[in-house]
């Protein structure tokens, strides 16, 4: 009870937005207002992964090409066991939880770097009302949205010198989709500039940026063409 009382404002704000996000995302799905692309395709893929079947794109293509030949998205594999609990709502629920977790990450980041008690709450609310979130929720599910919500926690890990944690978070973001790896590359470049006076952090971030770029290039040049029926990316 003490923990709840201590964080009552952030819990209340987050609960209100969980309700709002659910009214958009889950209600749309309940009334059959969600789409075959991407939610239908991805839910089908997650269901197949949960049953140890390699998911394909036969739902949208004439050939039985593995879905990994489109986007190299490993979140569908990671989240697939949850389909036994939540069925076709799985990815929508995961996305909502990710958004709330991302908001809390932003709150914590501003709480750590600043000394004004009100700023973290403003940052939290700003994130929750950001228009891009509602565009994503109204068009079902996106793995890159889930990955984006990890970014604040990545910032916190770098700020607090939690290098092992930062590597784990980086890997989790990279496996969302190949294009997000390029986004992470530029994030790390920005952090290199931010921490340019800290040699240890700079070297660590340079390594992470190179890992991100290498992952992006390997996936688009080698892995996706391997799974693609056209043997090329895109």
Give residue spans per PLM region.
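Start-transfer (signal-anchor) and selected internal transmembrane alpha helices
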Residues: 1-24, 111, 201-210
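Transmembrane-helix motifs of polytopic, lipid-linked glycan transferases
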Residues: 89-114, 153
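Specific aromatic-rich, kink-prone transmembrane helix
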Residues: 105-108, 129, 143-170, 186-188
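Juxtamembrane segments of multi-pass membrane glycosylation machinery
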Residues: 51, 70, 74-95
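Short acidic/glycine- and proline-prone juxtamembrane loop motifs at membrane-interface regions
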Residues: 135-144
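Extracytosolic helix-loop segments that constitute the early lumenal/periplasmic catalytic or substrate-binding loops
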Residues: 23-26, 41-67, 74
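Membrane-lumen/periplasm interface segments of specific transmembrane helices
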Residues: 24, 38, 48, 55, ...
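Short helix- or helix-capping micro-motifs
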Residues: 120-131, 170-174
């Amino acid at each position: 009870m003490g923990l709840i009382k201590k964080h009552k404002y952030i819990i209340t704000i987050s609960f209100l937005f969980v309700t709002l996000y659910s009214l958009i995302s889950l209600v749309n799905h309940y009334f059959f207002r969600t789409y075959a692309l991407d939610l239908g395709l991805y839910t089908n893929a997650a269901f197949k992964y949960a049953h140890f079947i390699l998911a394909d794109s036969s739902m949208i293509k004439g050939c039985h090409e593995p879905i990994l030949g489109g986007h190299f998205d490993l979140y569908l594999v990671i989240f697939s066991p949850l389909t036994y609990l939540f069925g076709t709502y799985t990815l929508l629920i995961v996305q909502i939880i990710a958004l709330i977790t991302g908001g809390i990450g932003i709150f914590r980041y501003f709480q750590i770097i600043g000394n004004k008690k009100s700023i973290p709450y403003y940052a939290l609310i700003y994130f929750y009302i950001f228009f891009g979130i509602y565009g994503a929720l109204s068009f079902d599910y996106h793995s890159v949205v889930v990955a984006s919500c990890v970014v604040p926690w990545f910032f916190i890990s770098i700020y607090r010198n939690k290098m092992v944690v930062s590597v784990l978070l980086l890997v989790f973001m990279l496996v969302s989709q190949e294009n997000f790896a390029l986004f992470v590359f530029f994030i790390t470049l920005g952090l290199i500039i931010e921490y340019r006076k800290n040699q240890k952090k700079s070297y660590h971030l340079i390594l992470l940026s190179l890992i991100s770029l290498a992952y992006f290039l390997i996936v688009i040049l080698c892995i996706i063409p391997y799974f693609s029926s056209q043997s090329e990316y895109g």
